[in-house]
Amino acid sequence: MTVREPLRPVLYDDARDLVRLLDQKALPAEERWLELSTAEAVAAAIQDLTVRGAPAIGVAAAYALAVEARRGAGPERLRAAADLLARARPTAVNLAWAVRRMSARIGAPASDVLAEAHAIRDEDEAACRRIGALGAPLVPARARVLTHCNAGALATAGYGTALGVVRAAVEAGNAISVFADETRPFLQGARLTAWELHRDGIPVTVLTDGMAGWLMARGEIGCVVVGADRIAANGDVANKIGTYALAVLAAHHRLPFYVAAPWSTVDLATPTGADIPIEERASDEVVVLAGQRIAPAGVPARYPAFDVTPAALVTAIVTERGVVRAPHAAGLAALATAR
C-alpha cells in the first residue's frame, strides 16, 4: 500500500529567514502555521506544546539558532539563545543534543549555521525511515498495534518513530490497524495520532487511557509500539506519562513492547531512568478542559509529563543503528560505536 507523504511540522523559510511551525495545539480542528523569528518565540512554542515530540523540538531549536544567526546575532546573543532553548523542556534529550550541536557552529558564517540545522532535520527524517524499515518486520501480520501519545511525523522532522514503524509495515503490505490511546491531558493520541493516521489512510481507533488492559485480555492487541524522549544507558525509557502502565500491562499479557527512537534520544551519559529529570507541568493542564474546570475548585492535581519504563519491560529498542534486545545496556553500548 502507498501511504501519503507525511507532513513536516518544522520548516525553515529561507527567503524570509523564519521558522515555520505547525501549531499542534490547533489540531485537529485547524491546520495553522506560525512564523517565528526569534529564539524566545521558538522556546515559548516548545514550552507551550505548539511544537512537541523530542526530535521535532530539537529541529525547532536548531532552526531558532539558525534564524538568529541569519539575522545578524553575534556569539554572545547566540550563546544566550542556546541556553534559553536548551532549558525549554528538560526531559527530552534531543533538545539539548541539537542545541549542543548548533552551539559548536557559533562563530561560523551564518550560512554554515543554517546548513547545520538543515542537516539535523534531514538526518532525523532519514533516521525515522530507517527505524521504520528495521521495526516493520517486528509487527505481527494483520496486528492491531497500540500506541501512546504521538510519535509520528508530527513529533519528528517527518515520517515518525513509532508511527514510522506503522507506516513502514503498511507500505510493506502488512494490513495492520492502530489503537491510539487518547493520552490525557493534552490528548496527543486522540488529537494528533488519530489525525495523522487518518490523513494518511491508515486505520486508527481512539481509546481512552484506561481501556488497554481489557483489550489486551480479550486478545485484541498484537503489540505495543511507542516512542521515547530519553533512553538511559541501561535501557530505561522516559516517555509520555502512561507509558509505564502500558508496559506493565503488556508484560502481564505477554505482548511485545517496542520502543522506537533515533539514536539522538539515547543518552549514554545518563546511567538509569532514575537519573532522568521528569518535567512537572502546571496542574491546570489536568483540571481545565476546553476552558472549563472539570475538578472541584481547591482540589489539587499532579502532572508529571513523563514516566520511566524499566528496561526489563522493553522487548526491543529500535534505532536507526539497529535493534537492541536484552541485555539492553550491552546492546546500546555496542551501537554507540556503530555507524
Curated annotation (Swiss-Prot):
EC top class named in words: isomerase
Active site: 229
Gene Ontology MF terms: S-methyl-5-thioribose-1-phosphate isomerase activity
Entry EC no(s): 5.3.1.23
GO BP term, pick one: L-methionine salvage from methylthioadenosine
Pfam families cross-referenced by the UniProt entry: IF-2B
Record bears the keyword DNA-binding: no
Pathway assigned in UniProt: Amino-acid biosynthesis; L-methionine biosynthesis via salvage pathway; L-methionine from S-methyl-5-thio-alpha-D-ribose 1-phosphate: step 1/6
Keyword Amino-acid biosynthesis in record: yes
Catalytic activity line of the entry: 5-(methylsulfanyl)-alpha-D-ribose 1-phosphate = 5-(methylsulfanyl)-D-ribulose 1-phosphate
Record-linked InterPro entries: IF-2B-related (IPR000649), IF-M1Pi (IPR005251), IF_2B-like_C (IPR042529), Initiation_fac_2B_a/b/d (IPR011559), M1Pi_N (IPR027363), NagB/RpiA_transferase-like (IPR037171)
Highest taxon above the source species: Bacteria
Residues that bind substrate: 52-54, 89, 188, 239-240
UniProt record similarity statement: Belongs to the eIF-2B alpha/beta/delta subunits family. MtnA subfamily.
Functional note: Catalyzes the interconversion of methylthioribose-1-phosphate (MTR-1-P) into methylthioribulose-1-phosphate (MTRu-1-P).
NCBIfam families reported for this sequence: eIF-2B_rel (TIGR00524), PRK05720.1 (NF004326), salvage_mtnA (TIGR00512)
Protein name: Methylthioribose-1-phosphate isomerase
Record organism: Anaeromyxobacter dehalogenans (strain 2CP-C)
Organism lineage string: Bacteria, Pseudomonadati, Myxococcota, Myxococcia, Myxococcales
